[in-house]
Amino acid sequence: IGTATTTEEAAALEAAGVDAVVAQGSEAGGHRGAFLGPPGRSLVGLVALVPQVVDRVDLPVIAAGGIMDGRGIAAALALGAEGVQLGTAFLVSDESTASDTHKRRAAASADDATTITDTCTGRDARAIRTPLIDELERSGLDVPPFPPQSMLTRPLHEAAAERDRDELMFMLSGQAGALARPGPTKEIMERLAREAEAAIERLAA
């Protein structure tokens, strides 16, 4: 399974022989799966990306990015996806290894609280904007590539998490972090299934 952020990348993955393609919309938290073209070019939203990838490749398409509940799952399936991939939806779950500060910031974040930056790891990633990210971006300094930059900054982020210094932390999150719900992963999965079924029934009514 490969990740594509554009139809061009999806076609390249199909040519390489993958079994399925994850269509990663720009809303997705974490590192971008882009691998063709200059950084920052492939910021296509999920609603625009999924149907174009579905039409471009003869492979199962898995939608990822900003899907947080059953409504998002139903929408992705309506766009032609055969499955979904959720990450931020489980960020505040009981099993999540994110720090309490990270969970709190993500759950309380506004829809414009994240940014895509390479300053912390050397690779574009969507994370909660912090004073550290702002300062690094304003500095104009050249950022080493991944993974050296990640190795250089990780000790700072880990120490900041231990001291509850969120202004110095690197907190990955999608654009809909406020929709993340706490609890055991089992219960979250069951709720997602119920919500998706209900949303699909509403669409079919």
Feature locations, PLM:
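Short, ordered loop/turn segments at secondary-structure junctions
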Residues: T5-T6, G25-E27, A89
